[in-house]
Amino acid sequence: VFINAKCRGSPECLPKCKQAIGKAAGKCMNGKCKCYP
């Protein structure tokens, strides 16, 4: 699931995903965070 968070690298998305979906799993795609439920 894509969240409305910009990123330059996948590690930036982990805390954002944890905040958004409660799980620190995801990666940076095309400058946006994609989180895995």
Curated annotation (Swiss-Prot):
The record marks K27 as: Basic residue of the functional dyad. Disulfide bonds join C7-C28, C13-C33, C17-C35. Keywords: Disulfide bond, Ion channel impairing toxin, Neurotoxin, Potassium channel impairing toxin, Secreted, Toxin, Voltage-gated potassium channel impairing toxin. GO terms for molecular function: ion channel inhibitor activity; potassium channel regulator activity; toxin activity. Signal peptide: none annotated. The keyword Mitochondrion does not apply. The keyword Chloroplast does not apply. SUPFAM superfamilies: Scorpion toxin-like (SSF57095). Gene3D superfamilies: Knottin, scorpion toxin-like (3.30.30.10). It is found in: Secreted. One of its GO terms (cellular component) is extracellular region. It holds the Pfam family Toxin_2. Expressed by the venom gland. The record marks Y36 as: Aromatic residue of the functional dyad. Blocks potassium channels Kv1.2/KCNA2 and Kv1.3/KCNA3 with high affinity (K(d)=1.9 nM and 10.7 nM, respectively). The voltage-dependent steady-state parameters of potassium channel gating are unaffected by the toxin in both channels, but due to the fast association and dissociation kinetics the toxin slows the rate of inactivation of Kv1.3/KCNA3 channels. Has the structural arrangement of an alpha-helix connected to antiparallel beta-sheets by disulfide bonds (CS-alpha/beta). Negative results: has no effects on Kv1.1/KCNA1, Kv1.4/KCNA4, Kv1.5/KCNA5, Kv11.1/KCNH2, KCa3.1/KCNN4, BK/KCNMA1, and Nav1.5/KCNA5 (when tested at 10 nM). Belongs to the short scorpion toxin superfamily. Potassium channel inhibitor family. Alpha-KTx 04 subfamily. This is Potassium channel toxin alpha-KTx 4.6. It comes from Tityus stigmurus. The lineage of its organism: Eukaryota, Metazoa, Ecdysozoa, Arthropoda, Chelicerata.
